[in-house]
Every structure is written in structure tokens, then in C-alpha cells.
Amino acid sequence: MKFILLALGMLCFSVEMNAQKASDSEWNDLIWSIAQHESKQNPNARNGQYVGYLQISPTLVNECNKIAGRKKFSYSDRLSREKSIEMFNTIQGRYNPQHDMNLAVRIWAAGLVALKNHSAGQRAYREIMVIYNRHRGEK
């Protein structure tokens, strides 16, 4: 049983390691698609503790500041489209430097638990990829 679980774990790791890095255009379209899913592109959107263009929580702002090693972002920055994208890229730069789109969406939807739980955030990934593919097809 342990061998099967180890093999399955290695397969999941292998899939993540072989993921293609998104181009700048693909990455920007992915961010657009996440924002469409999260807030309908509304930088003033609010849903409980989640605020702004990318629906950022206070916990995420704190994590971005921890990564930056200083207080670079404020809670009000969540209302700025540009600062929201910068926070998204800060998180992804630390935890997803390979710009794997599946992992990017799962981290955004489920949090850092997605790094260990490969099913976390999969529903959001499927929903966002529908938006993404539609958006890319319109270009």
C-alpha cells in the first residue's frame, strides 16, 4: 500500500514538474480570467473578508508583506487593480515560479494548501479555464 501511495505521489509530482510555463500573454489572460471569475473585473467588489479585483483577503496581504520582508502592501491596496495584480504575482513568484497555470489558479482559489493537496481548487480551476479559453478565443 505504501508503494502505491509513493508511486501516486511521484506521479503527481512529475505532472507538476513537467507543466509548461505560461507565456506572458497567457499569464496576463489567466489573471484577467481569475478577476472575471472572482469579481467580474470590479476593483471595488466585496465578499466578506475578500476585497477587490482579485478578491484578496487580509491574510494574503500579510503573506505578501512577509515575502517582501517589509510592509509593502496595505489592506486598501486590495482596491487597486494594479496592486492586486502585483500581490498575485508576489504569491506566484514565491510558490509557483514556474508559472504553472493549474497551480496558479489552485493556489489562488484554495490557498497554500494547494501545494500539498492536488485536488484543492480544482473546481475553481475548471471554471476559470472555461472563462480563460473563451477569452483567448475572442482575441
Task: For each feature predicted by the language model, list its residue ranges.
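Cleaved targeting-peptide boundary
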Residues: 18-27
